Amino acid sequence: PEILARIKQHELAYRMQTSVPELMDLSGESDATFELYGEEARQAGSFAACCLNARRLAERGVRNIQIFHRGWDAHGNLAGEHGNQCKDIDQGSAGLIQDLRQRGMLDDTLVVWGGEFGRTPYCQGRLGKDNYGRDHHPRCFSIWMAGGGIKPGITYGRTDDYGYNIADADGNQLKPQPDKHKWTPGTMHIHDLNATILNQLGIDHRKLTYRYQGRDFRLTDVHGNVAHEIIA
């Protein structure tokens, strides 16, 4: 069985590599598609081109697709840097969602846009009018999701008035942030986010385990609740 598995692995690698030239050739895409994603989609390696390629990968059955976009770590010159970053990702992101919708793929595709932390509500650095930064802030941050059975056009969760801590529905700060041992509706711990994403992929986060150093682990540790309030 091990030899047969290795043979299949090499065969899969061959099929994947030989499919790349056709996948990356965007010459067959219509002008309307490039208008949707933006003219930068014609430029290889641009964020818009990556979004277009993400749709093409999804069409070919690729189950997990990740797009990277660097340059958000603005400890200085945040106003200029984040403004340019938003311009870079805006049309490509919107184009991807619209393209998936018009092709009937959005209901079966979950788009998650976010990072590993947010930025502090207070400034750092030179503190000039046009040149200031913000530090890392893992206590609370925002992401957005589209498709994949998630309710459109809603917001979920809130912070305190300073944007520093997670708060309950009445705006009261939660300690800890939030309590991963106690489910508080309207808030989302990172374990809850992972549990919800897995749920939309048809996976029960309580049953999915992997073995490491002789022990079974869950991606959500021993915590996590599915946020049914955001599921359509």
Predicted regions and their residues:
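Ligand-binding pockets and gating/stacking loops
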Residues: 1-232
